[in-house]
Amino acid sequence: SDVYKRQDQKHSGGNIAVRREKIMNIIAAVDKNWAIGKNNELLVRIPMDQKFFRETTTGKVVVMGRKTLESFPNGLPLKNRTNIVLTHNPAYQVKDAIVVHSMEELHRELEKYDTNDVYVIGGQKIYEQLLDECDVAHITKIDYAYDADAYFPNLDEKPEWKITADSEEQTYFDLEFYFYKYERVQK
């Protein structure tokens, strides 16, 4: 589904050169303060955002930390995706997922895939560790400030990231939210 209704011209005047070396993707839903969670749970579940996440990542490779995996229903890997879980626990195993124990091991595993097909899906530590290796960020911004204990790096404060597409305003009950596509631009 193409949630982005307005692209490039509005945001960049068409003159931003986007980096295209290692195009790993990152995807997250954030509130006004770039918060992503509390007590290892999402802040809110918005069906349209979940649908966008599902459609964007199905058939792709998703990279996550152990806590993110354990926050899924029954702690099970996501269906119809290659799940890669990064944990420092050497004994950790999970059915239907690839478990790696270091960034080096993760990078060796990722060499098997087209980086266009790799989506970093959380949580906070994984986002922080892998943001610099991503060139595209799909961010759902919820116009509300939640009580939270986990955050995504604020891309609006990072000059190397620019919004290249956005959606019209979306609503879910009394919540307003938008889909934004950020891309890392060349210096």
Map each language-model feature to its residues.
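Short, small-residue-biased leader/transition segments that mark boundaries at the very start
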Residues: 1-4
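Short, Lys/Arg-enriched N-terminal segments with co-localized hydrophobic residues
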Residues: 7-23
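Enzymes that bind and transform nitrogen-containing heteroaromatic metabolites
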Residues: 22-187
